[in-house]
Design a protein with these regions (language model features):
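N-terminal Lys/Arg-enriched interaction segments
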Residues: 1-161
Length: 161
């Protein structure tokens, strides 16, 4: 598959965790995920560099530029304005994570709200079992993305009740 024609997922400030999973997969597919690591360095070339050093330097510089472009292209204008002055993909990624993922207290509140939403779910008369199961699974996966265990048996139990 030609991944150059696949558009990145767009982040508008909502559902950071879902966007981050999709964006990581997108960057992996383009072989750019390593640019998000702390030790990804594009240092200056030494005096009288070898051909191999020049090639490696150019590849790393190009990867960093592509990753930065992907991140810029994957956010709404509102989010872009907040990150446009950041220099590296790592800085952009870390900023988005800190800004939108939320601290532990916020995440625990999100988990509590999702668990409440799960418990309050009832299958509607005109709803198929598949639609209802998909809705429950969606809530469960959001809880899991927030780092909380959620067993499949709990979903099955809810489906059977």
């Amino acid at each position: 598959m030609d991944f150059s024609k696949v558009a990145p997922p767009i982040f508008d400030g909502e559902d950071y965790d879902l966007w981050a999973v999709r964006m990581e997969a997108f960057l992996d597919a383009l072989d750019l995920s390593e640019t998000m690591e702390d030790d990804y360095d594009v240092s200056s070339l030494p005096k009288d560099p070898t051909t191999e050093q020049m090639k490696t330097h150019k590849e790393r510089k190009t990867k960093r530029a592509k990753a930065k472009t992907c991140l810029f292209a994957s956010v709404s204008q509102t989010v872009f304005i907040k990150i446009m002055t950041l220099k590296t993909p790592k800085e952009i990624w870390d900023y988005l994570k800190e800004e939108y993922k939320g601290d532990e207290r916020i995440r625990s509140m999100q988990v509590m709200n999702l668990l409440r939403e799960f418990e309050l779910q009832r299958m509607k008369e005109d709803e198929t079992i598949k639609t209802y199961a998909d809705k429950l699974l969606g809530i469960a996966n959001k809880v899991r993305l927030l780092g909380t265990q959620f067993s499949d048996s709990r979903i099955v139990e809810k489906l059977l009740v």
